[in-house]
Amino acid sequence: MIMNCKDFFAGKKILIMGLGILGRGVNVAKFLAERRAELTITDLKTEEQLASSLKKLKKIPNIKYVLGRHDLADFSGKDMVIKAAGVPLNSPYIAEAIKNKIPVEMDASLFVKLTTTWTLNVQVVGITGARGKSTVTHLIYAILEEAFKKAKQKVYLGGNVRGLASLPLLKKVKDGDVVVMELDSWQLQGFGEAKISPNIAVFTTFLPDHQNYYKNDMERYFSDKANIYRWQKRGDWLIAGSGAAKVIKEKDKNGAKWKTAKMSKKNIPHGWKIKLLGGHNLINIALAVEVARKLGIKEAVIKKTVENFKGLPGRLEFIRETKGVKYYNDTTATTPEAALAALDSLKEYKGKIILIGGGADKNLEYKEYAQEVKKYIKALILFKGAATDKIISALGKTKFPVESVDSMEKAMEIARANSKKGDIILLS
């Protein structure tokens, strides 16, 4: 534990804005309560909606809760506000805190800020991108975990990994450790506000996403993403995928070194047997390998881990084969480009793919997606929602059936009815 960590938060009046239900807010609250902070927690969700999170905090006394709303008065008289990712850019409550000269922090960036302030020699590897960041994050973590098995060094996961909070890592990290952080654009807002970047930054891809939040302001979206490298120092590294490298700006201004990571079927290292499907995953592997090399990890360890890495749940994950029909789960593909990448990975099955998708819309464009989909599939099943309406409009006339459903049960019923031996049912 960092010695400063024991007393830094003690007695501070801290407002947590956004408890949530995925665990990160709960873990931040527990950590701060252990450090004797005076806590207020506010969330737009109601007590009923937050029941699972509140249950985990019920043994902690003296937390003030303001639920189902925010009160402007709570954003004054505090020593710090810790906001959750996704708080609106124009939040009047954050504006009130800033007006009252209250520091506004975020979990991941505050962790990095404090390790830097306390001159702890912890290497932070940050990964962002529209696609691939979770796979790259977990592959880097797996490589380092294997490499550090018999070492004093430890590796930890942080950032946007589900259920994990970064601040509690202050209890664990020590000199020489590495923290691997998946970072979305919202969390990188915090890095920009703190004017810090990871020691090693990985930028996988850049594609439109979260445009319902950014109100179609791609420059603002990119600006938040660019905080992954914008505040790097001499001696730091930026590792970029080829797609991201085309749009990266300011890359020569901060003294950090940078490299574009590439891999294709033609240049897979000799003797490597890779299990992950798809060209996009070869780029993900290349990014992770470059990071491992920059950290001095032996090639044998890298090769062993890459060959044993099977990917993550929901990322073109093979589920089962029944009656000759293969089922794949790619539900983390929430943009048209990500779904097309999955189809391209299964291109040997062109004309044999039953695609299940659609649903809610994030203010994205679907014209190219609709035309490309036609090249791969034999049937399309779409969950009702704004995205589905746009996809159906963009498709026009088709030679394959298009169905709109309101439940997974109905989607699978239709998919099975349209499938035969040798087909693929893909949820993406």
Residue ranges, per PLM feature:
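Short internal beta-strands
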Residues: A37-K45, L238-S242, I353-G357, Y376-A386
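Nucleotide phosphate-binding/pyrophosphate-handling subdomain across enzymes
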Residues: I2-K13, L19, V28-R35, N121, ...
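C-terminal helical cap/extension that packs against the catalytic core
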Residues: S52-K64, H70, K367-D423
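Residue-level signal for inorganic ion chemistry
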Residues: L32, V81, I127, E182, ...
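Phosphate-binding loop of NTP-binding sites
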Residues: D7, A33-E34, L72-S76, A85-W237, ...
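Generic hydrophobic/aromatic pocket-lining and core-packing "Φ" positions
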Residues: V26-A29, I94, K225, Y366-A370, ...
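Short beta-strands and strand-loop turn motifs
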Residues: M17, D107, F203-T205, I425-S428
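N-terminal leader/targeting and accessory segments in enzymes
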Residues: M1-M106, L110, T117, L277, ...
